[in-house]
């Protein structure tokens, strides 16, 4: 299973093509729209979310509500395109139009300057349009398909925010996906402890009033994953490495950890490793889950615990200094549109990205033409594990 996305932030539409989804999976536009709506929610969101109300159109790979094994094409229309039709036109236009909304003042923390240097662009809008977080719309759309497939296999995924800036959100060590959905899933801050919500909203409002932004830490948990996904045999087959790469590929994510994560580097080994236990009923399990469900690049049958670190949104209403690429004169960086935080929305993106990687790994391991064949292969594999 693999996918590609295409489209610019202010272009006519965003597109994703997914190849390798087994035939026979029930799938509707509404399955995807539910996830897209989640991405557009959350406290601290602003301008663009009022303009866009994302709805997907499935144009291939699904017939009469079922996948048919061919590539699935997903399209999301950019409703704001009507205001950018000439500026973002594919055909050549007059110079005076080209100069409209031209960007020569790169924003610190964005791809603007380096992208312009790499591709020899005079107008940095060519970089901004593709590097924008708007692209994550299609990462979520793809993830919605992956989550539908995982649900059929009794694998579930959820996320919650564990830090807003320096504000840590309290949550229990043992936390099920269902508990996350029943708490963080109903919170506009995506937090487990709603008693901290009002203080956090005040904090976010203060950040916004100051013209600043904040980042934080998001945790995604996956349940129902069997032991043995991924491999220790080669570096590029380790599933935790694949997930880490996918998470830091999300706009503004700068780090990832599993289980204890970086805390493991501060503890002695006896306080980090998960002891192995066995019972006739459950087979091999662990007494704890400090390693976040991974050993040797493989899933060990425990819940997957993945955390991603999101930097503050780099577009600031109190802009930092930059250099005009045309005149080389100092200038205050441009403001396109910005929110004080996008952590709740970023959590939805991370959740769907992690789901996609897990679904890809399952489809690769149990290469199946149909969803029924895939289900049977997974059942047979679990049976083999239980007999070890």
UniProtKB/Swiss-Prot annotation:
NCBIfam families: aroC, PRK05382.1
Gene coding for it: aroC
Reactions catalysed according to its record: 5-O-(1-carboxyvinyl)-3-phosphoshikimate = chorismate + phosphate
Protein name: Chorismate synthase
Annotated metabolic or biological route of this protein: Metabolic intermediate biosynthesis; chorismate biosynthesis; chorismate from D-erythrose 4-phosphate and phosphoenolpyruvate: step 7/7
Keyword Lyase in record: yes
Reported cofactor(s): FMNH2
Enzyme Commission designation: 4.2.3.5
Xref: InterPro entries: Chorismate_synth (IPR000453), Chorismate_synth_AroC_sf (IPR035904), Chorismate_synthase_CS (IPR020541)
HAMAP family linked: Chorismate_synth
